[in-house]
Amino acid sequence: MTSQPHLHQHAAEIQEFGTVTQLPIALSHDARQYSCQRLNRVLADTQFLYALYKKCHWGMRGPTAYQLHLLFDKHAQEQLELVDALAERVQTLGGVAVGDPRHAARITGVPRPPDGIEDVHSMLSRLLDAHETILADVRDAATRVAGLGD
């Protein structure tokens, strides 16, 4: 036995994304599967919204730059708190939370912004549209998973 750390280890996945383990939580496998699927979509959207807030935060220009810079940073932090709560809920249901930003970018419903800097009005509009997209999906998901008992 050695006290040296075991570096550069890579093991096989112990649970694939999109699967749920059986847990004694009085909720059917199908209900947990569907809930995890919908929650992962919301999680990906929220991760993407966090990144969008930071992009706007860093790219702020003009006379309201300072105030919006602070506001966007506050909202970005709130998104991070939601990301953690959503991911933990997926795990609680026996699922695997989407944790890789590349994976989140593939499953998000929030449109990708341009790579450059937009004007302030476009940034605000893009953020509002992203929130509306997420809210519509969350409302639909909540209704459907409630119908399954979750």
Swiss-Prot record:
Any coiled-coil regions, as ranges: none
Source organism of this protein record: Kitasatospora aureofaciens
CDD domains for the chain: DPS
Protein name: Uncharacterized protein in bpoA2 5'region
Disulfide bonds: none
Keyword line: Plasmid
Pfam families linked: Ferritin
Highest taxon listed in the record's lineage: Bacteria
Family: Belongs to the Dps family.
Gene Ontology molecular function terms on file: ferric iron binding; oxidoreductase activity, acting on metal ions
InterPro entries per record: DPS_DNA-bd, DPS_DNA-bd_CS, Ferritin-like, Ferritin-like_SF, Ferritin_DPS_dom
Organism classification: Bacteria, Bacillati, Actinomycetota, Actinomycetes, Kitasatosporales
Keyword Phosphoprotein appears in the UniProt entry: no
